[in-house]
Amino acid sequence: MPGPWLDTRHALALVILLCIPAQSFQTGSAAQNTGALPAKEGLEYSVEWRLIDAGKAKLTWSANAQPSHAGWQVNLHLESTGLISKFYKVNDDYVANLASDLCVQDTHVNAHEGSRQRETLVHYDPESRKANYLERDLVKRNVALAKETDIPRCVHDVIGGLFFLRTLNLEPGHSTEVPVSDGKKTVSAKVEAQRREEIKVPAGTFKTIRYEAFLFNNVLYRRDGHLYVWLSDDRRKLPVRIQVRLQFAIGTITLQLEKEEKT
């Protein structure tokens, strides 16, 4: 049971890469529409694994209230539900603090997955161009991993870039390369706008554009797989559906938008 749920959390993180800012890496035409960026928003998703209701996810975005972190904060909460939760309980929280230009400053993860409990802190320093990664095992009360990684001056975590893509107009047939780091590894990953589709999810029926992020197959992760996201084809560019297709032993993980909260 741990394998699918660990991949679900990674899927949530990876899928948000589609929304990392393209800036000078873009290879297609994508005019910016800054009006699409909300001041505050909450998006709630159902999580399905092998056609079973497996969990819930909530993604929130807001201006950062901390004076030392002028910019934005992104929060992701993931929890297992129903029958899955009885066998393998998951309760994960991810927080990313971003500068006003959306470059990541630091991330904090509290992961409770079955008997596994980990806390991970990553600090990104644009001056030294280093990321400092520290992972603690909360059960054994020791340091599981500590390392330093080279990064570019502006880099993006796999969660925090979500809302920037919604300021762009990346049309089908165009792609972008973006710098991404999880604190352990830094890569340049391709994101491709593929085609327009109309899809139905619990939150309603949406006209969308489907994107693929090429993160598997030894890019950011070694596992073979495909990562897709459907953004609404309108000014809001809501992440309506997220899907990770992995090898047969794990299967397909799908997130579908259930509710949008905005102010």
Language model feature labels by segment:
Residues 1-13:
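Bacterial N-terminal signal peptides that target proteins for export
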Residues 11-23:
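Bacterial N-terminal signal peptides
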Residues 28-126, 164-263:
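Acidic, serine/threonine-rich low-complexity disordered tracts
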Residues 131, 135-151:
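Acidic/charged, solvent-exposed loop-and-adjacent secondary-structure segments enriched in E/D, K/R, S/T
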Residues 156-162:
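Hydrophobic, aromatic-enriched interface-forming segments
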